[in-house]
Regions:
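Short, surface-exposed acidic
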Residues: 53-55, 235-238, 272-274
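Noncatalytic linker/hinge segments flanking ATPase motor cores
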Residues: 62-67, 240-243, 251-254, 277-283
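Active-site cores that bind ATP or allylic diphosphates and position pyrophosphate for catalysis
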Residues: 88-253, 260-265
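Short secondary-structure transition/capping segments
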Residues: 61-76, 98-107, 129-132, 139, ...
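N-terminal Rossmann-like or analogous alpha/beta NTP/dinucleotide-binding catalytic cores
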Residues: 1-100, 215-233, 248
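Extended, charge-rich low-complexity interaction segments
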Residues: 266-282
Length: 283
């Protein structure tokens, strides 16, 4: 239901503005990409009455584009290589000398800077293939602020609401994202890219003007805006929406099969029934 709500809301907003609803297959993580799952996406969206331009953009076809932009950021010393595993990050951030419980950002526990301290930046003309690549947030956010037309304040326009009701012009500083987001991974060792980098480049390539997505991605938008500044790409208008939750207030997860659209459909539900369930106007 959560994905249905997001897709229906985006579709309704696009139609109201005379725009296009775009579908993109984000399949860079092969452990979560299956032909059967992709086919189910098409089936569900078509059943809901949604239409989109074809062929759809597929991220797995654009790996060379992501590598090219990573190379650009690497040469400009916005990236550093990192060999830390998730366990390494958790243990370092939870070490006794760190004091309080580790801070958590959009990608989980904030990276404590282990490999950054080694200053493993642009050494050699090619990207390292034996390590992840992290964004050096201090340098990146500082430069993004200088590039921005309003001085050192970085901003984007929000027409929905963040998790704490944030709306309108959302402004933030380099100091804020250094402390609350940190050095995020831009290229995983096993896939050569990341969600953050890929969606920024894909949105620009598709000419996306409005991004509609869940409020759980609100903080990640700050990462995306910084990348847009560094790569000289346009910043869309963002609309973050509420999350669909169960009767106990728990967010519905992808694995919550009990609320899969196919089951509602098999039980005789109509697309307008789904709209009513998620609180959207019927078509």
């Amino acid at each position: 239901l959560g994905h249905a709500y997001s897709a229906l809301l985006a579709y309704d907003m696009a139609m109201a503005e005379g725009g296009e609803f775009l579908l993109r297959i984000e399949d860079i993580d092969k452990s979560r990409a299956r032909p059967a799952w992709e086919a189910q996406i098409y089936k569900d969206l078509e059943w809901l009455g949604l239409w989109w331009p074809k062929p759809v953009m597929r991220q797995s076809d654009r790996l060379s584009v992501y590598q090219e932009r990573l190379q650009n950021l690497w040469k400009r010393q916005y990236l550093f290589s990192c060999t830390c595993s998730r366990r390494d990050v958790q243990e370092a951030a939870s070490a006794p000398q760190e004091g309080a419980a580790p801070l958590v950002g959009p990608d989980g526990i904030l990276y404590p800077g282990t490999c950054r301290e080694n200053r493993s930046f642009a050494i050699g003309p090619t990207l390292p293939t034996d390590a992840a690549l992290r964004l050096w947030m201090e340098r990146a956010a500082t430069m993004a602020g200088e590039i921005h037309e309003n001085g050192k304040v970085i901003s984007f326009t929000e027409t929905g609401r963040g998790p704490n009701g944030e709306t309108g012009l959302i402004a933030f500083t380099a100091e804020e994202v250094i402390q609350t987001i940190g050095d995020v991974v831009l290229a995983r060792r096993d896939m050569g890219t990341s969600y953050h980098l890929s969606v920024v480049l894909d949105d620009a390539a598709q000419g996306v003007t409005h991004v509609v997505r869940g409020e759980d991605l609100f903080e990640a938008t700050k990462i995306h805006v910084i990348l847009q500044r560094l790569l000289r790409l346009p910043t869309p208008i963002y609309h973050h929406h509420r999350l669909i939750r169960d009767e106990n207030g728990k967010r519905l997860a992808k694995r919550d099969d009990a609320r899969a659209l196919s089951k509602y459909r098999a039980e005789g539900a109509t697309p307008n029934d789904i709209r009513r369930l998620v609180g959207l106007p019927v078509a």
